[in-house]
Amino acid sequence: MELNLKGKTALITGGSRGIGFGAARVLASEGVNIHITSRTAADLDAAKKKITDAYKVTVTCHPCDLAAEGAAEKLAAEVGDIDFLVNNAGAIPQGTVVSLDEKTWRKSWDLKVWGFINLTREYYARMAKKKSGVIVNVIGAAGERHSSGYIAGSMGNASLMALSRALGADSHKDGIRVIGINPGGTETDRQVVRWRALAEKQFGNAERWRELVTGFPFGRLGTVDEVANMVAFLCSDASGYTTGCVITIDGGASHIK
């Protein structure tokens, strides 16, 4: 399928690794010029090299901490107008309502929840002026499959699902589409490190980590590309009637009791 994205511009937060990097790479393969953010400049430089070695697009790196006050406004001023915003940065730690202290809770929400909100506010206004744009929020399936052991993540993700649905329900009036994506278990570097540690503990052999995920749908984790391809599709006019919804990519795990 031809997505007709060549020459467009996208900003992907958390774009140096994992799903964010995957989204940047897939969009670049479609001819989209890329802006990526991360808190680590070296990671951004490595991601840029991988993309520009493979595709003839412009990749601009923006080292920044989107949890900082005023960071979204500053980033938007640096990047300028774009066609697609992919909010992806941020990871919320495990923990119960008792074990997670307020400082940790607030810090994680400052990056993921407020990071998404603040950049959406900045770019929604810009996109509305030109009556065109797509905002994709890469959230997480815990927002719909809640866990008391992941209380901050469940609540934070649920709030971003509400943002995507509420804003996207009326955004057509401004020529904008807003969509959420909820990845389930996905084979990112970060997740593989976690599974390898569990395999080392259980089997004494980190290389056996795949044995621990056979209980997932299809006997495996999802791949980064399976999420990244959806990001690219949602950005395209091929998905031009899609807004105000959240698409779950978890192999059906959310429906398993």
Predicted region positions:
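A glycine/serine/threonine-rich, flexible loop-to-helix segment
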Residues: 173, 187-215
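Short, small/polar-rich loop/turn modules that mediate ligand/substrate recognition or access, typified
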Residues: 172, 177, 242-244
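Conserved glycine-rich Rossmann-like NAD(P)H-binding loop of the short-chain dehydrogenase/reductase
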Residues: 30-46
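Conserved glycine-rich cofactor-binding loop
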Residues: 9, 16-18
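Catalytic loop of short-chain dehydrogenase/reductase
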Residues: 136-159, 164-173, 185-186
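Catalytic Tyr-X3-Lys loop
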Residues: 91, 98-118, 132, 136, ...
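Alpha-helical segment proximal to the catalytic Tyr-Lys
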Residues: 125, 169-170, 240
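Short C-terminal tail/terminal secondary-structure segment
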Residues: 19, 145, 232, 243-257
